[in-house]
């Protein structure tokens, strides 16, 4: 689906330790927030307001929506709040994988934030889902996270 996906080899993947934890960003629409509430894992929300911040001190998987106009318009695919969060070295260093949401109406830029962040952070893109996700997406992500943590 995305031409610029960098495959992370098995040797490069750093498996997370500790409690299963997702860090996520959700816009005012709260689509991602509502999805996260269906997961059975510890979670931390990246604040919407750029002046606010959180610091993470344990391994996590990042879940983010995608912002972009579709087609050739991939600029701005990663929300500014996520970029600000990851600009802190400590937050960036604990990220072990990425899951992205998007809208299939935008064609080949569907969930584009996932491949962009996976490549930038050199972590695996674990899953992509549409908008609010389905019950199947919830079950699949719970399974992926449990397996990724080795639980």
Curated annotation (Swiss-Prot):
GO molecular function: FMN binding
Biological processes, Gene Ontology terms: protein modification process
InterPro entries in the cross-refs: Flavoprotein-like_sf, RNR_Ib_NrdI_bac, RNR_NrdI
Gene3D superfamilies associated with the record: 3.40.50.360
Listed SUPFAM superfamilies: Flavoproteins
UniProt record similarity statement: Belongs to the NrdI family.
Function: Probably involved in ribonucleotide reductase function.
Listed NCBIfam families: nrdI
Protein name, per record: Protein NrdI
Native source species: Mesoplasma florum (strain ATCC 33453 / NBRC 100688 / NCTC 11704 / L1) (Acholeplasma florum)
